[in-house]
């Protein structure tokens, strides 16, 4: 039987978590990496750990690949270099709508380079037939900017991924050049596609993911990521049981439950 390993970048959000589940379901055992890069939403790392523990339980029950480990990679020193971005710079406000300042320059390239280095180490240590590096970039991340026509997040594009894969192979020994880099965007999958797959496969666990750019008790409901999360649940035709501090859509569509809001599509108490 072919042995597959995936080095999966898992942020705690629905995209990277679901895509990791997909590779587990394909029979690949996962070495999960989460990154502390000085982001404001530091709770996403703790979320990733809890989700991966549950994912491994499900994988064991279903005969999938296993979550072999979860490593936290500390690159928080990059915060001082990634200035002027909404996600790391305390002096830059997190906005409701997309703005180029939400893009952390080639953040995914940095993380994928580290993941690829680890993946090559696995190829040298183990008898592995296939090794893939995965991350959660999805089709919505590469919609064209209205002003320039280029992807909203350039390092999420299939072109970037394929170029990186080629570079990673070129930059190591010929006998090791079988490393693959994959993302939902490369497979043509959107956030709503991922939510539908996850909801149909692991059910309510998808609500435990964390999308918000901030670090509050609940999803803020105001940042671009919260708004995109809610829109994707609607596009997928799924109830959104996420707890929001403020409604990420028309207030009439949400129900106040004490100190948070939930969309009326959610029937949970």
Swiss-Prot record:
<dbReference type="GO" id="GO:0008270">
    <property type="term" value="F:zinc ion binding"/>
</dbReference>
<keyword id="KW-0547">Nucleotide-binding</keyword>
<keyword id="KW-0436">Ligase</keyword>
<dbReference type="InterPro" id="IPR018317">
    <property type="entry name" value="QueC"/>
</dbReference>
<feature type="binding site">
    <location>
        <begin position="10"/>
        <end position="20"/>
    </location>
    <ligand>
        <name>ATP</name>
    </ligand>
</feature>
<feature type="binding site">
    <location>
        <position position="223"/>
    </location>
    <ligand>
        <name>Zn(2+)</name>
    </ligand>
</feature>
<feature type="binding site">
    <location>
        <position position="220"/>
    </location>
    <ligand>
        <name>Zn(2+)</name>
    </ligand>
</feature>
<comment type="similarity">
    <text>Belongs to the QueC family.</text>
</comment>
<comment type="function">
    <text>Catalyzes the ATP-dependent conversion of 7-carboxy-7-deazaguanine (CDG) to 7-cyano-7-deazaguanine (preQ(0)).</text>
</comment>
<dbReference type="Pfam" id="PF06508">
    <property type="entry name" value="QueC"/>
</dbReference>
<protein>
    <recommendedName>
        <fullName>7-cyano-7-deazaguanine synthase</fullName>
        <ecNumber>6.3.4.20</ecNumber>
    </recommendedName>
</protein>
<feature type="binding site">
    <location>
        <position position="212"/>
    </location>
    <ligand>
        <name>Zn(2+)</name>
    </ligand>
</feature>
<keyword id="KW-0067">ATP-binding</keyword>
<feature type="binding site">
    <location>
        <position position="226"/>
    </location>
    <ligand>
        <name>Zn(2+)</name>
    </ligand>
</feature>
<keyword id="KW-0862">Zinc</keyword>
<dbReference type="GO" id="GO:0005524">
    <property type="term" value="F:ATP binding"/>
</dbReference>
<dbReference type="InterPro" id="IPR014729">
    <property type="entry name" value="Rossmann-like_a/b/a_fold"/>
</dbReference>
<dbReference type="GO" id="GO:0016879">
    <property type="term" value="F:ligase activity, forming carbon-nitrogen bonds"/>
</dbReference>
<comment type="pathway">
    <text>Purine metabolism; 7-cyano-7-deazaguanine biosynthesis.</text>
</comment>
<keyword id="KW-0479">Metal-binding</keyword>
């Amino acid at each position: 039987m072919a042995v597959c390993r995936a080095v999966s970048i898992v942020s705690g959000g629905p995209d990277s978590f679901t895509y990791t589940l997909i590779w587990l379901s394909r029979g690949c055992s996962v070495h999960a990496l989460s990154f502390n890069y000085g982001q404001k939403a530091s709770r996403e790392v703790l979320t990733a750990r809890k989700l991966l523990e549950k994912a491994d339980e499900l994988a064991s029950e279903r005969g999938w690949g296993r979550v072999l480990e979860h490593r936290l990679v500390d690159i928080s020193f990059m915060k001082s270099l990634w200035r002027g971005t909404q996600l790391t710079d305390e002096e830059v406000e997190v906005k409701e709508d997309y703005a180029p300042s939400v893009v952390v320059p080639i953040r995914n390239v940095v993380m994928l380079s580290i993941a690829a280095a680890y993946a090559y180490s696995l190829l040298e240590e183990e008898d592995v037939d296939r090794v893939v590096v995965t991350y959660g970039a999805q089709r919505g991340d590469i919609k064209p900017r209205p002003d320039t026509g280029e992807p909203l997040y350039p390092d999420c594009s299939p072109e970037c991924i394929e170029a990186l894969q080629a570079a990673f192979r070129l930059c190591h020994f010929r006998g090791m050049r079988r490393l693959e880099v994959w993302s939902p965007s490369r497979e043509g999958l959107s956030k709503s596609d991922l939510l539908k797959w996850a909801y149909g496969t692991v059910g309510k666990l998808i609500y435990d993911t964390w999308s918000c750019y901030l670090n509050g008790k609940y999803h803020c409901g105001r940042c671009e990521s919260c708004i995109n999360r809610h829109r994707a649940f609607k596009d997928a035709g799924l109830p959104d049981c996420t707890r929001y501090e403020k409604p990420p859509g028309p207030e009439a569509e949400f129900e106040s439950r004490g100190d948070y809001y939930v969309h009326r599509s959610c029937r949970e108490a």
